[in-house]
Curated annotation (Swiss-Prot):
GO terms for molecular function: diamine transaminase activity; identical protein binding; putrescine--2-oxoglutarate transaminase activity; pyridoxal phosphate binding. Pyridoxal 5'-phosphate binds at residues 150-151, 274, 332. PROSITE patterns: AA_TRANSFER_CLASS_3. It comes from the Bacteria. This is Putrescine aminotransferase.
Length: 459
């Protein structure tokens, strides 16, 4: 039965939410009521499937904790006052921590002046952020298109490559097996997981996939496409596959792909949505081997965990296809003042606190610790891998991975699996994680593995 719109109900709901936003603390009854309310609204108005997903990583089989506020730079507090060390990092958005004061202050100061741009007058922060990224990014990258997410940055990269290469008769794209580039139609065409792709077939034509890390397969595909007249417009890669399970390519793979792109006249698009902004121990993962892309995709941590923002940064040669008509590809909220303020502050924090170098140091410490645990528990752990503060623990099967996440939840450490590889648990904390907190995480992992071994033996 269709229901009639109710202004009174909408008004009451919004007023209740505003009252909640004003609160700093909740008493016991308020907490219980909010937990029930949030679960009900997720079930009835968001997506009931999310409840089952959250349920799989909670202690005792109850529904997931309801988030309330940041506890500090590296922790979250739920409505029950429980504090969790964040080793998930919002899937890579909290590189400078939760509510970093420099980022929050920049956004608040801009909010006091003008939160969104007029669309007609020139907005200064967009210009300043574009200039900053031109200075920060490698090679000849010079111009930036701003959007709101990683998926949008990939969409822009695909369109930019198409616009540049279409006059040259090049329309084919090569991505890799295990890749994740987003779930909008264009980005999904480059993504390589059937679960996400199958319901939306047919996707964009002209996308091919080759095994990640296999330079011979890449060379063969480029060559075969040339032979059949399906010349390649661009190769799109993650320097390290994040959702694929934190998969690192062999040393020399990215430089070799760059060389092949030059040989065949294809553009190189690097998707650093997850690996960028210091995550792997360099500002950008491509810098580990001095690889310079034609187009670079950024998002997630670019907004400092305070505002959503994505960026597609390209060389002048490629970006110039938009010069004559800058409205060929636009988005209303892309490059808005609040998002640009957050991004500028984030870059400032990353550089002044040398967080990429900290990520390298702390990442080595955590990786060494996890690898020692893997040696102690070879019956549970297949492999530990990663670079900087992007790490993964691969378990012997999916069930062990789920159980490890639940055990870590009991130890008040948040972790989660990857979208393309269920038995792999990703460790992706803020780069601001302290050495003491690193030790706490390793202790929690040891306890979790010990508990898992007991449960496996009992089963």
């Amino acid at each position: 039965m269709n229901r009639l719109p109710s202004s009174a109900s909408a008004l009451a709901c919004s007023a209740h939410a505003l009252n909640l936003i004003e609160k700093r603390t909740l008493d016991h009854e308020e907490m219980k009521a909010l937990n029930q309310e949030v679960r009900e609204y997720f079930k009835e108005h968001v997506n009931p499937g999310f409840l089952e997903y959250r349920k799989s990583v909670t202690a005792g089989g109850d529904y997931g904790a309801v988030e309330w506020q940041a506890g500090g730079l590296n922790t979250l507090v739920d409505t029950q006052g429980q504090e969790f060390i964040d080793c998930l990092g919002g899937f890579g958005i909290f590189n400078v921590g939760h509510r970093n004061p420099v980022v929050v202050s920049a956004v608040e100061n801009q909010l006091a002046k003008q939160p969104l741009h007029s669309q007609e007058l020139l907005d200064p922060l967009r210009a300043m952020l574009a200039k900053t990224l031109a200075a920060l990014t490698p090679g000849k990258l010079k111009y930036s298109f701003f959007c709101n997410s990683g998926t949008e940055s990939v969409e822009a990269a695909i369109k930019l490559a198409k616009a540049y290469q279409s006059p040259r008769g090049k329309f084919t794209f090569i991505a890799t097996s295990g890749a994740f580039h987003g779930k909008s139609l264009g980005a999904l065409s480059a993504t390589a997981k059937s679960t996400f792709r199958k319901p939306f077939m047919p996707l964009l034509p002209g996308f091919r996939h080759v095994p990640f890390g296999d330079i011979n397969a890449m060379r063969t595909m480029l060559s075969e496409c040339k032979k059949t007249g399906d010349d390649v417009a661009a190769v799109i890669l993650e320097p390290i596959q994040g959702e694929g399970g934190v998969i690192l390519p062999p040393t020399g793979y990215l430089p070799a792909v760059r060389k092949l792109c030059d040989e065949f006249g294809a553009l190189l698009i690097l998707d650093e949505v997850q690996t960028g902004m210091g995550r792997t121990g360099k500002m950008f993962a491509c810098e580990h081997e001095n690889v310079q892309p034609d187009i670079l995709c950024l998002a997630k941590a670019l907004g400092g965990g305070v505002m959503p923002i994505g960026a597609t940064v390209a060389t002048e040669e490629v970006f110039s296809v938009l010069f004559d008509n800058p409205f060929l590809h636009t988005t209303t909220f892309g490059g808005n003042p609040l998002a640009c303020a957050a991004a500028l502050a984030t870059i400032n924090v990353l550089l002044t606190q040398n967080l990429p170098a900290q990520a390298a140091q702390k990442g080595d410490m955590l990786l060494d610790g996890f690898r020692l645990l893997a040696q102690e528990y070879p019956d549970l752990v297949n492999e530990v891998r990663g670079k900087g503060m992007l790490m993964a623990i691969e378990f012997v099967d999916n069930e062990i991975g789920y159980d490890f996440a639940s055990e870590m939840f009991r130890q008040r450490v948040l972790v989660a699996g990857t979208l393309n590889n269920a038995k792999t648990i990703r460790i992706e904390p803020p780069l601001t994680l302290t050495l003491e907190q690193c030790e706490q995480v390793l202790k929690a992992a040891r306890k979790a593995l010990a508990a898992l071994r007991v449960s496996v033996e009992e089963a």
